[in-house]
Amino acid sequence: MRSIFNELADEQGFRRVELSEYHRYRDLHGAALLRELGLPLRKLPRVMNSMRRRMADHRGTLSLFPGIADALHRLAVSGVQLAIVSSNSRENVERFLGRDNAGLIGCYACGVSMFGKASKLRQVLRRSAVQHQYAIYIGDEIRDAEAAKAAGIAFGAVTWGQHSQEALRAQRPAEIFATVADMSDKLS
């Protein structure tokens, strides 16, 4: 993902994310991150669309975090209704998951705008007939926590993704999952 982002940075004139700086960016959110990268908000939709297209082109080089496939199967077998709300396209999400894993997902809401996840979360709850008090939205970004709060559902933070554990802890998640196994153990 970083390499795809850096390709776009070079083409569109904003700052690259070097590996040595990556951990510093994990604590930044929203406007602060865009400001640090020199990426104007007006360019964000175009950059996100380009990211989606490039991710589709690079699908063979992207893979799930170790243990995710097993966790999805374990959760599905235990009766957990799985859904995905993502700003990425459904096609990219399904390709990324692979056919077997994608088949475990009961509801998709993909292609969501960067700041439109809360309404999609509410829509997924209605479509799946899950009451908000029984739902948890698992994510790795501060905006995931904000969307869950706006939708009136619990947020579970995973520490192996976009934002740091400290940044996510500040959002007061219902659960913090340090490992994939920790997530599947607590939820199944």
Feature names for model-found ranges:
Residues 25, 66-67, 88-89, 112, ...:
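Short beta->alpha linker loops
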Residues 56-97, 118-119:
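Short, acidic loop-to-helix structural element flanking the phosphoryl-transfer center
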Residues 1-69, 77:
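N-terminal helical cap/lid subdomain that shapes the substrate entry/recognition surface
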Residues 39, 78-80, 153, 173:
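Short phosphate-binding/catalytic loops that engage adenosine nucleotides
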Residues 20-22, 103-116:
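A short, structured active-site edge motif that brings together acidic residues
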Residues 100-108, 167-187:
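Structural recognition of alpha->loop->beta junctions
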Residues 136-178:
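Acidic, Mg2+-coordinating phosphoryl-transfer loop and its flanking beta/alpha structural elements
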